[in-house]
Amino acid sequence: MTHLDKTAGSATSGSAEEFVGEIREARPRDYARIAELAGQLGYPSSADEIAKRFDGMQHSNENAVFVAQLGGEIAGWVAVFVYRVVEADARAEISGFVVDERYRSQRVGMHLLARAERWAREKGCRAIGLRSNVIRDRAHAFYERHGYKHVKTQKSFRKDL
């Protein structure tokens, strides 16, 4: 196993910022576990549904999903994409982020977040954002500890088609 530092990708030797594991791009064999963790996030999905979503994303180099693997198990994942709009410069957006309840407060989320941020910088993005349900106070505190600032409160609207 690889020791990862807080840049979530470079090898290092013993520091308080480490965990024993690997941050890597998601693979088809991860779909069932990604689906299981999506359920913990509040978005129940099957492995087949995850596979279909990945199939739709794999033709773009502006989407990525990274997993944290610890001891042979996927402990969490983060999905990130480049968000392009007319009215502002491109930025990265984290569309999904979950760490298994059993692995929280063990630096897994920190390493996943760092990997998503590094990917965004590699894509030329100068900012990264995310949206988080108002009830997720613990997640909000985590984001703030890692340099994210609450920039606005808004209502979200959706229409089924």
What are these regions (language model features)?
Residues 1-29:
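Conserved N-terminal entry element of GNAT/NAT acetyltransferase domains
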Residues 2, 153-160:
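Active-site/acyl-donor-binding loops of N-acyltransferases
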Residues 3, 25-90, 95, 113-115, ...:
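Acetyl-CoA-dependent GNAT
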Residues 97-104:
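A short, internal acetyl-CoA/4′-phosphopantetheine-binding micro-motif in the GNAT/acyltransferase core
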Residues 105-118, 141, 145:
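Conserved acetyl-CoA-binding loop-helix of GNAT-fold acetyltransferases
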Residues 120-132:
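Conserved GNAT acetyl-CoA-binding A-motif
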Residues 130-139, 158:
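Conserved beta-strand-loop-alpha-helix junction that forms the acyl-donor binding cleft
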Residues 144-153:
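Conserved acetyl-CoA-binding loop of GNAT-fold acetyltransferases
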